[in-house]
Amino acid sequence: MKFETEHGCVVSEMATAYGNSKQIGRYAIAATMNEVLTRAERVDQMEIRVCAPLEEKKKHLYDVKAEAARCAREHGQTFWEPEIIRAAWAAGTFVQVNALAAEVKQQAWNKETMRAGQDIVLTKWIGLEGTLRILDEKRSELGKRFSGTFLHQVEEFRETIFAEREIRVAKAGGVSVMRQVGEGGIFAALYRLAKEADTGLVVDLKAMPVRQETIEICEYYKLNPYQLASTGNILMICDDGEALADALRKEETEAAVIGRLTDNNDKIIQNGEDIRYIDRPAPDELMKI
């Protein structure tokens, strides 16, 4: 969210992550950091809250708090001491993060103008956030189905939910607009993008990078990877998508041109010879876990 001021503007974002894992704060921190950085040079301040039902064990809450604080420090964030809140209204444990950037100056990359004909670039592999969160919550069950090596490969992608590097590259590479994929997955993000741009779009499903690990875990739980949480994936709108994707790949970030904005209202997904239209965003597939 952006607020105009006499000195520029203020960018403020909030994200919430639910779950039983002590890692849940990482996802909320990554989501807010990425969102702010797509509109500002840096995050100036972060606020972290751990909320839980009255009966939640104290040790678990302090573990969640400690992990969130450690993650924020690792990524160079300034934050107030995380707060723990127990409440009767809380249905489960969650971490809420607010992040703020003050006095943001307008530059070429944050004028946020989109038009038909521009390319859509997608960074990294879709659904990795959701894949990691399923692993966090269902590790024992997954261990009976998949090898330890397979699960370790998933773990190695834990830092991919943070997008500082590719956002920095895009700012120098002619990007017009950046939007995080996030909750609801790539289908929801594309729908929101087209509505915001007041254009249509056409994208190639086969061009969207997805890890085999995500596909197999989604098949096991009968989930759609294209509707799975994707914090860390950034949609980038620019005039020359191939040049931007090349610049990102040179910085060791997976990137692909997946489509373009069009001068109508159709939101089209091509899958070989098949064509379908993007529906209104559905609930994130994580809700089924």
Segments predicted by a language model, with ranges:
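Helix-biased detector of long, well-ordered alpha-helical tracts
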Residues: 1-289
